[in-house]
Curated annotation (Swiss-Prot):
Enzyme Commission number: 3.6.1.1
Residue sites binding Mg(2+) 2 per the record: 71
Enzyme class: hydrolase
Binding site for Mg(2+) 1: 66, 71, 103
Chief location: cytoplasm
Record-stated family: Belongs to the PPase family.
Subunit structure: Homohexamer.
Assigned GO CC terms: cytoplasm
Protein name: Inorganic pyrophosphatase
The keyword rRNA-binding belongs to this UniProt entry's keyword annotation: no
Length: 178
């Protein structure tokens, strides 16, 4: 099974999506789902002494402007194992450029954690935590000589619109799943 192509984008898109976790919170290893095989591949070990501040992955059957599946960050209290499917509620979007390409990332919370039941939009996330996430993504490629720019945060509605657009981009690239 290749989860990128065979999993649906979510049970109630765009209100609830599947986050296919590639990288657990706290990791310095950057894993990526191999789009051809569906296996997890070590892409690189971060050059910097940083670690991922959130669980990080993709939304299945999506494609984005950077030429990859649409990225999703899930705020969890405990790290999740790679290749875990998390039902996630989008609450915002980080507006970012990576080497000049639009590389926005959905920010979400797990549906099945009562701790986050009242987190519905970006304003529900403590600003200090948003700043930590932005700082990580602003700096994590610096020692590789690559440039990333975090331009700010969008709300849940903006995230949901981008999810729907990413699903359409997937259909254009790979064909509509029957």
């Amino acid at each position: 099974m290749n989860p990128f192509h065979e999993l649906e984008p979510g049970p109630e898109v765009p209100e609830v999506v599947y986050a296919l976790i590639e990288i657990p919170k706290g990791s310095r290893n950057k894993y990526e789902l191999d789009k051809k095989t569906g296996l997890l591949k070590l892409d690189r070990v971060l050059y910097s002494p940083f670690f991922y501040p959130v669980d990080y992955g993709i939304i299945p059957q999506t494609w984005y402007d950077d030429g990859d599946p649409f990225d999703i960050m899930v705020i969890m209290r405990e790290p999740v194992y790679p290749l875990t499917i998390v039902e996630a509620r989008p609450i915002g979007i980080m507006k970012m450029e990576d080497s000049g390409d639009k590389d926005w990332k959905v920010l979400a919370v797990p549906v099945e954690d009562p701790y986050f039941k009242d987190w519905k939009d970006i304003d529900d996330v403590p600003k200090a935590f948003l700043d930590e996430i932005a700082h990580f993504f602003q700096r994590y490629k610096e020692l590789q000589g690559k440039t990333t720019t975090v331009e700010g945060w969008g709300n849940a509605e903006e995230a949901k619109k981008e999810i729907l657009r990413a699903i359409e981009l997937y259909k254009e690239k790979f064909g509509k799943k029957e």
